[in-house]
UniProtKB/Swiss-Prot annotation:
Known catalytic reactions: 2 D-alanine + ATP = D-alanyl-D-alanine + ADP + phosphate + H(+)
UniProt subcellular location: Cytoplasm
Residues annotated as signal peptide: none
GO cellular component: cytoplasm
Keywords: ATP-binding, Cell shape, Cell wall biogenesis/degradation, Cytoplasm, Ligase, Magnesium, Manganese, Metal-binding, Nucleotide-binding, Peptidoglycan synthesis
Name of encoding gene: ddl
List of residues binding Mg(2+) 1: D279, E293
Annotated residues for binding of Mg(2+) 2: E293, N295
Name of protein: D-alanine--D-alanine ligase
One record GO biological process: regulation of cell shape
NCBIfam families, alphabetized: D_ala_D_alaTIGR (TIGR01205), PRK01372.1 (NF002378)
């Protein structure tokens, strides 16, 4: 009898999956990534997985080879984490991972490329184009006020500037005239030029901020965000009390359905996996909906939008959502396995 009990215990030990949590990294969203990583670690511990945290750096490949995990949970945000880089490394190492693959991650992270995809699918998106730092300094801008200037491949509203007037432009020009010695701190509300010579400039869409979650190839729901300030910026996204979350979004039914359809259409077209979040602006004055971007690695703490929508629509708590992501990700084939 004791032998049977011991064998059962050993079997359970052997069946425990080792999951590495990749967080931190090099991007300006490092702080948020570490928060996501800690939340995932807490959930994995409560779910009795063998969870190992890795703060991603140049030695990450060696650490992963040594650990040889059953799965890597990607809790990274921004460049190198959600742009296909870490996904490519994991493919080479033969390690399964969560969220979307190399191609979907790379395309979704590139705002200019994403806008072309949206238009090709018949989805309206703000008018805009790629602009150089030099053209900004010379005021060689082909879009009328107000307009939005943002990095091609950043998240969390980092480096986003809304310009309503010539006075705003002069402030922007002064800011961009300074060439930083290094990247500005992630917590700065008005970061200086982001060590890139190209950005996206697009028309400003007044109205309502909307976020749609896709979970397991199903559009789960759309949330409305009402920031306390004019703009849903870094502080509003990650500071309690700086934005009000309204669910379901208080918009016309046909517009609500349109957000679900657009989010799912882009998710499927790019080949996104497990979860994604699409962002929209709705202008009630002219009844237009514009898709801004799709996020393959949305923020992932218990207070983040996708977990909140999953809880409100499906009754799925954070721990259960983590388990769903893991189980779904383990079923995905690695690129090298696809024939």
């Amino acid at each position: 009898m004791y032998v049977v009990i011991i064998n059962i215990v050993l079997l359970k030990v052997l069946m425990v999956l080792t999951i590495t949590i990749l967080s931190g990294g090099f991007s300006r969203e490092r702080k948020i990534s570490l928060m996501s990583g800690k939340a995932v670690k807490k959930a994995l511990d409560s779910l009795s997985y063998n969870a190992i945290e890795i703060d991603v750096n140049s030695n990450t490949a060696e650490k992963l080879k040594k650990i040889n995990p059953d799965l890597a949970f990607i809790a990274l945000h921004g460049p190198y984490g959600e742009d296909g880089c870490i996904q490519g490394l994991l493919e080479i190492l033969g390690i399964k991972y969560t969220h979307s693959g190399v191609m979907a991650s790379a395309i979704a992270m590139n705002k200019a490329m994403s806008k072309h995809i949206f238009r090709s699918l018949g989805i309206d998106t703000p008018k805009g184009y790629i602009i150089s730092r030099g053209d900004i300094l010379k005021n060689n801008i082909k879009i009328d006020y107000p307009y939005v200037l943002k990095p091609i491949n950043e998240g969390s509203s980092i480096g986003v500037h809304i310009t309503f007037s010539h006075e705003d432009y002069l402030k922007l020009k002064n800011m961009f005239s300074v060439i930083p010695v290094h990247d500005a701190g992630i917590e700065e509300e008005e970061p200086v030029w982001i060590t890139r010579d190209l950005m996206i400039i697009e028309e400003y869409i007044p109205g309502i901020e909307l976020h749609t979650a896709v979970l397991l190839d199903e559009a789960a729901g759309t949330m409305e965000i009402r920031p306390k300030n004019k703009f849903y910026d870094y502080k509003a996204k990650y500071t309690n009390g700086f934005a009000e979350h309204i669910f379901p979004a208080e918009i016309p039914d046909n517009i609500y359905e349109m957000t679900l359809e657009h989010a799912l259409k882009v998710h499927r077209f790019l080949g996104c996996k497990t979860i994604s979040r699409s962002d929209f602006r709705y202008n009630p004055k002219d009844n237009t909906l514009k898709m801004l971007e799709i996020n393959t690695h949305p923020g992932f703490t218990e207070l983040s939008l996708v977990p909140e929508i999953a809880k409100l629509t499906k009754g799925i708590d954070f721990n259960e959502l983590v388990k769903i992501i893991i189980e779904d990700s383990l079923q995905h084939k690695k690129i090298l396995e696809i024939k």
